[in-house]
Amino acid sequence: GLGNNAFLGVR
């Protein structure tokens, strides 16, 4: 994922 966001980073 984006990496900078805990939720989007996991995707």
Swiss-Prot record:
Subcellular location: Secreted
Keyword Secreted: yes
Tissue expression: Expressed in the CNS and midgut but not in the ring gland, thoracic perisympathetic organs (tPSO) and abdominal perisympathetic organs (aPSO) (at protein level).
Keywords: Amidation, Neuropeptide, Secreted
GO cellular component: extracellular region
GO BP, sorted A to Z: neuropeptide signaling pathway
Location of Arginine amide modifications: 11
Function noted in UniProt: Myoactive peptide.
Protein name per UniProt: Tachykinin-related peptide GLGNNAFLGVR-amide
Species name: Delia radicum (Cabbage root fly)
